[in-house]
Amino acid sequence: PLDSPDYMNAFKAAKAQGAFIFWNHPGWDAQQPEETKWWDVHTQLYDGGYMQGIEVANGSSYFPEAQQWCLDKKLTMIGNSDIHQPIQTDIDFSKGEHRTMTLVFAKERSTEGIREALNNRRTAVFVTRAISPPRERKRES
């Protein structure tokens, strides 16, 4: 079903295999310059149970709209570096720089423990010396 003209078949196959599916690059400039937008396809994926998380930070890019969607829709926050070459070409560790990463608050050190934490949204995103909140915040009115 992965070699199919209907992209939903890939999501159905991934879900059937128990995959943890998350949306990468919600604020990708090449796709939607200067805004982070929730498209109809994302509603379809979310409503169908095909999306468990969203990447709220990628490299030095942070997508506050994506973080709010995670809070509103009870999705897991993910952060990635998206580095496609040796890390030291982008990160200067001697200056205290670090890659963007997902902190997973697992109850045990195992694959199952990590998956359980992801499923229950026990993550935080470490990006540019800040950590996104791992739990809901009250919005200011």
Describe the predicted segments one by one.
Residues 31-141:
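Charged catalytic cores and adjacent phosphate/nucleic-acid-binding surfaces used
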